[in-house]
């Protein structure tokens, strides 16, 4: 029964707090007589000043930490302290400066009445119909400003003043994968792949490096420095300045790798409503397979996949361009090869929008034998009226190469959109001497809303055999005279077609693609076609794919490959939460038919553990393969492992990935990170989860790294209140940050570490401390609360024993102060509350 009485008291305190803080709607001012709540000891005895509560939402004047909104749109990255004072009506009025109003989009220049000569606080009454609404219970300050008094800007534009360059820090991103394969009667194959991405942030500057290491027992060890660069944003130009290794944009010319400098537009700095690209790799594995992605001979990505369809959507930008070569190494040692086009195309620009790039430096080839010739390049794309876009550029490498490009794009309304451009080149290469030629390119895109059809056609035609790109020309200047065939062959025609057809909710969707290429110097050509169908039946998904590839070699010999695959996925949530079963079959010419059965799922509340088991009957070999895989996303990194076994072979894979962030407050370990990240600072709050990020939680000091943020956009970093410990309170669980590209932004949270204590305070005569008195931890006004009826007060963040300071009175010479020493004791039950009784004297 005692426990019941205790809970009722606690509930009454909460109800009392809610009554004081609840919003009220009325046609007349509400009033209550504070005398009804006063407890007098006799004539002349001091009483608690409750006059501030006589009006609706009444609160004492002073500093309040609030979220600030303008016209119900949040304009501050996080809560901030604002001084409130009483106006003539007895209501609280905020002190905001002219600079702050201007920062938040108010047209202060048109309203000189805002300025007050003897105060830094702006006079909101200087704008007709403007007013401030302080919602105490939500700690929200909303400034209602007429639209005519606001500066014009896009609805989704984030003011530059809110962009956060982040904190100084050292970074190290690492990813290591090891793979072992044992074949009956053959030597065991072992390989290890490691990539390291160290970095340094100081103010707006970002220093980055990408280094890889490969080792196998067959080919030895090899280190490669893929790139190093120094970068910063130039806000006034909405651009990025890059010094070091990178690649020129591919919107007008083919992308060219360089070591030097580049100034280029960064469209991410623009609002979404007025403004980029890395391909998604898709394929089908017949067994537990190792997927390796190479670009220009470098390994840029490696991972292990389970049998069936896979998708790689986290391929990092390598700072280079060129088609991606994808190798799928199956458990039986066989390999599949895919080629994924990797190039971006010019896009139509809004009227008046200009995008540019200026690049200069050494041609950065992907092997040590190519000479480092100097070149410069400039491109520009400008949006003209009536839906036209004009674009062009120049390239110059002295007497070795010059080219000029000019193109136009047009939005042709219901007919779609097209672009056409031409490049004229003059080249001096070591294999063919001086030549000149032209390249023409036409593209067309159209959405048929009535039929749900979207298709894009892109065609390249090298109209003369004398045309060469900058990379093809400078690539012939080599110390070994061994010019690669991809430079000497010179593509003549390349055509691409992609089509997506929505068949409606009841019938699924179709997609198709076609790529054709041929060359001037030999009979080599290729033709690839793909057709896919997808459909969901009440959460059961099916897919059917057909691909056809024909490659003709240097002397006309053709190889052809046909692959047909079918897959069905069935959720098993009724039996096992977050689990699904899959069956897939693949028929490939030359490899027969394989069948695969999989069971996959995730575990824990935040789905931080992914697991899978599978069984495969592989192709013509009729090898039976069984295996499994597991991946665990922890706060300090990610671990993964896989194992498969057949009659003649075994495969074992394992890996670890993560990042180390060294900052002014210490060292924080995390999962692998993206380009732009956040650092949670919640001092002393250990084990607090971060919403929407599996496995991320604060360390023993209260720090955690949020691995992915969007630059130049509002990002909410929200802590999971369900993971709060009984001895931890956090005032605000969500912070809003606006990072610049590559920044590490800090999201600070106000924490109170200690016990929640329900305390009964009495005076030496045994009477309770008066209702409405303010109680706080001695020498700390952070832990403060209002005393309720019977001298009871609920405080959080208290040590087990300490001293409270209690004040009451009307502030007119009748204020009473006393101190109360206490020792708290844990309550029975699972409420997490502690109790204490103390005499205030």
Describe these PLM feature segments.
Residues 68, 281-283, 678-682, 755-764:
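A short, amphipathic beta-strand motif
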Residues 60-82, 684-693, 765-779:
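Short, ordered, surface-exposed loop/turn motifs in non-cytosolic proteins
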Residues 163, 190-203, 224-237, 372-386, ...:
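Feature captures outer-membrane beta-barrel proteins of Gram-negative bacteria and organelles
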Residues 140-144, 346-349, 733-754, 821-841:
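Extracellular beta-sheet/turn segments enriched in Thr/Pro/Gly and aliphatic residues
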């Amino acid at each position: 029964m005692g426990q019941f009485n205790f809970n009722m008291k606690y509930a009454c305190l909460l109800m009392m707090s809610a009554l004081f803080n609840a919003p009220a709607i009325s046609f007349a001012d509400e009033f209550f007589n504070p005398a009804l709540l006063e407890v007098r000891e006799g004539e002349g005895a001091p009483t608690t000043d409750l006059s501030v509560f006589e009006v609706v939402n009444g609160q004492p004047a002073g500093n309040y930490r609030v979220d600030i909104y303008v016209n119900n749109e949040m304009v501050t990255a996080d809560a901030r302290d604002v001084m409130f004072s009483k106006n003539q009506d007895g209501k609280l009025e905020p002190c905001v400066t002219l600079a702050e109003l201007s920062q938040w989009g108010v047209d202060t220049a048109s309203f000189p009445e805002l300025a007050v000569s003897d105060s830094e606080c702006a006079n909101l009454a200087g704008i007709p119909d403007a007013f401030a609404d302080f919602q105490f219970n939500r700690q929200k300050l909303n400034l209602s400003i007429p639209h005519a008094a606001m500066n014009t800007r896009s609805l989704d534009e984030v003011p530059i003043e809110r962009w956060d360059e982040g904190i100084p820090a050292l970074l190290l991103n690492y990813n290591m994968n090891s793979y072992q394969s044992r074949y009956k009667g053959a030597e065991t194959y072992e390989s290890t792949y490691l990539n390291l991405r160290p970095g340094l942030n100081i103010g707006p500057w970002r220093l980055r490096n990408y280094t890889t290491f490969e080792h196998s027992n067959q080919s030895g060890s090899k280190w490669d420095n893929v790139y190093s660069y120094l970068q910063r944003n130039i806000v006034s130009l909405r651009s990025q300045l890059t010094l070091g290794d990178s690649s020129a944009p591919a919107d007008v010319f083919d992308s060219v790798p360089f070591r030097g400098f580049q100034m280029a537009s960064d469209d991410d700095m623009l609002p979404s409503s007025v403004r980029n690209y890395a391909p998604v790799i898709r394929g089908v594995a017949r067994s537990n397979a190792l997927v390796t992605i190479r670009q220009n001979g470098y390994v840029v990505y490696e991972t292990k996949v389970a049998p069936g369809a896979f998708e790689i959507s986290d391929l990092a930008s390598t700072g280079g361009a060129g088609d991606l070569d994808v190798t799928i190494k199956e458990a039986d040692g066989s390999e599949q090869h895919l080629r994924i086009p990797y190039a971006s195309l010019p896009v139509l620009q809004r009227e008046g929008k200009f995008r540019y790039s200026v690049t200069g430096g050494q041609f950065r080839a992907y092997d040590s034998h190519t000479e480092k010739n100097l070149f410069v390049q400039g491109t520009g794309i400008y949006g003209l009226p009536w839906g036209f876009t004009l674009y062009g550029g120049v390239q110059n490498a002295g007497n070795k190469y010059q080219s000029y490009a000019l193109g136009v794009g047009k939005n042709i309304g219901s007919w779609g959109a097209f672009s056409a451009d031409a490049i004229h080149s003059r080249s001096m290469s070591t294999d063919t001497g001086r030549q000149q030629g032209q390249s023409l390119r036409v593209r067309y895109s159209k959405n048929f809303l009535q039929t749900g059809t979207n298709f894009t056609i892109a065609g390249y035609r090298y109209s003369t055999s004398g045309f060469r790109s900058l990379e093809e020309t400078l690539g012939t200047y080599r110390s070994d005279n061994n010019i690669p065939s991809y430079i000497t062959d010179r593509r003549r025609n390349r055509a691409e077609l992609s089509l997506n057809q929505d068949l409606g909710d009841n019938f699924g969707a179709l997609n198709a693609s076609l790529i054709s290429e041929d060359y001037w110097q030999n009979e080599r050509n290729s033709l690839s076609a793909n057709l896919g169908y997808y459909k969901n039946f009440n959460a059961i998904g099916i897919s059917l794919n057909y691909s056809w590839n024909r490659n003709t070699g240097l002397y006309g010999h053709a190889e052809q490959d046909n692959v047909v695959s079918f897959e069905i996925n069935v959720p098993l949530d009724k039996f096992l939460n977050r689990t699904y079963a899959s069956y897939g079959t693949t028929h490939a010419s030359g490899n027969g038919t394989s069948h695969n059965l999989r069971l996959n799922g995730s575990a824990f509340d935040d789905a931080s553990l992914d697991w899978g088991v599978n069984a495969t009957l592989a192709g013509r070999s009729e090898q039976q393969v069984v295996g499994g895989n597991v991946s665990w996303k922890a706060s300090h990194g990610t671990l993964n492992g896989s194992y498969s076994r057949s009659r003649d072979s075994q495969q074992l894979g394992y890996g670890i990935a993560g990042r180390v962030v060294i900052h002014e407050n210490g060292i924080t370990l995390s999962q692998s990170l993206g380009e732009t990240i956040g650092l949670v600072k919640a001092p002393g709050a250990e084990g607090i989860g971060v919403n929407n990020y599996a496995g991320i939680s604060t360390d023993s000091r209260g720090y955690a790294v949020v691995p992915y943020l969007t630059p130049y956009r509002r990002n909410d970093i929200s802590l999971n209140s369900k993971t709060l410990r009984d001895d931890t309170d956090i005032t605000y669980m969500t912070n809003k940050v606006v990072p610049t590209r590559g920044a590490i932004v800090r999201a600070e949270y106000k924490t109170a570490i200690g016990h929640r204590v329900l305390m009964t305070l009495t005076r030496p005569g045994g009477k309770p401390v008066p209702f409405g008195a303010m109680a706080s931890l001695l020498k700390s006004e952070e832990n403060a609360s209002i005393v309720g009826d019977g001298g009871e007060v609920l405080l959080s963040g208290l040590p087990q024993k300490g001293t409270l300071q209690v004040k009451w009175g009307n502030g007119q010479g009748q204020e009473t102060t006393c101190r109360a020493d206490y020792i708290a004791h844990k309550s029975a039950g699972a409420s997490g509350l502690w109790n204490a009784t103390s005499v205030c004297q």
